[in-house]
Amino acid sequence: MKKIILSFAFALTVTSTAHAQLPVTDAGSIAQNLANHLEQMVKFAQQIEQLKQQFEQQKMQFDALTGNRGLGDILRDPTLRSYLPHNWRDLYEAVMSGGYLAAAGETANLLRKSQVYDPCASISDKDQRIACEAKVVKPVQDKVMTSKAYDATDKRLQEIESLMQEINKTGDPKAIAELQGRIESENAMIQNEDTRLHLYQQMAEAQDKLLDERQHELDAKDNARRGYPQPKALEAAY
């Protein structure tokens, strides 16, 4: 009997030892770990989305301050760039040497419309006639140039007013900066053209003096041809 009891006890010991060596699986712990992992993944995804939104906002802010809005030429009238001729001296010299024949374009049209009598038609001497014609054409030419300058300045001021209205319509900082740049450019062009017009007027005054001097010389030449007495200064010249 004692042997049987000892054998049964040994069998229980062996069985217990065998069971102790098998791994134990905790389903609750695995589920919790998986839930924690999924929660971390969701947080990572949210952080990535936030970073993406921040990047998009920064990009929008950057684009708002940089880039080209294409407003550099908005409302720009290219005809305002060349309303005053660059060859003033050539035009004056052409009028002085050609008289009516040198009048062209708007100058010729205005001359035809405004002239009610030709004071030079009865002058037989060619030089005297051309000098007379030059004095007739000169103020007409000045009138055309001054009118062009006035019209161009008026158009530029209208452009500036329109550009200011465009600024009030937009909230884009870069667009506003471009429009302000255009306004500054138009103001600079007005100042430049005003300087050119001032120089033109000075040249016109000098040209008037040259025409007067030429007429005096032609009169003196004609008087000398006719045997009329001349001033001593002119006698020395001839």
Curated annotation (Swiss-Prot):
> Region Disordered: what ranges?
219-238
Q: One Pfam family this chain carries?
A: T4SS
* Annotated InterPro entries: T4SS_VirB5, T4SS_VirB5-domain
Q: Which residues form a coiled coil?
A: none
Entry keyword set = Signal, Virulence
Signal peptide positions are 1-20
- The answer to whether the entry has keyword Zinc is no
Q: Does the keyword Membrane apply?
A: no
Name the protein family.
Answer: Belongs to the virb5 family.
Q: What protein name does the entry list?
A: Type IV secretion system protein virB5
